[in-house]
Amino acid sequence: MSLIRTETRDTKRAADPLHDLRSKPFSEWGEDEIRRFNLIDALLEFVYTDTSSPFGIGMTFDYTECWEIGVRDDCLVMTRVKPVHPEYAKHWNMKGVMNDKTRFHADKWVGYSKVLAWVSLSHKDTFTGAKRFQYFQTMYDMERQINANLPVGGLPNVDTERTGKLFQRDDFSEDSHANDPKLVGDDYVPQAPEQIN
């Protein structure tokens, strides 16, 4: 340990490019701050992304292509602006997801907003470990309020290039795993144990 403080604002900024944004309230953020804290930063800091499986890669495609970052009601939010990416959609029963009245899969609907943080990026750190649940509880309550008026199925969206007409696409299937080589078909009949060598 040194008695001379060697850490400066420049070294902190070099270690963390978002250092200046961490304590700045979201109410003071503008276009420049949103541009600096882009979607990739949001994914790395707030959203778990798995790139080691086809499902995880599809989820990452979906996050990078179908969501936008913005500030709403003093919260940093990610809002779905496009329907589910086809690589991600093939892992879900999309008709069931789009008609789900329980809203369990509402994050697949156009117009859904996920609250990533509230007040500022560093506000979470002002809560002690024992009280941190209050931060997340408030964050989830805000998310429910923001999405309270979102209709079942989400907002109408026309995306002729991709999934706007998901159910009319040639590659759409009710059984998204029909051609999965690791799974057997519906007509599969197992061999009797005595026939297996």
From Swiss-Prot:
Species whose genome carries this gene: Escherichia coli (strain K12)
> Where does the record place Basic and acidic residues bias?
168-185
Q: What is the official name of this protein in its record?
A: Uncharacterized protein YffP
The source's domain of life comes to: Bacteria
Region described as Disordered: 168-197
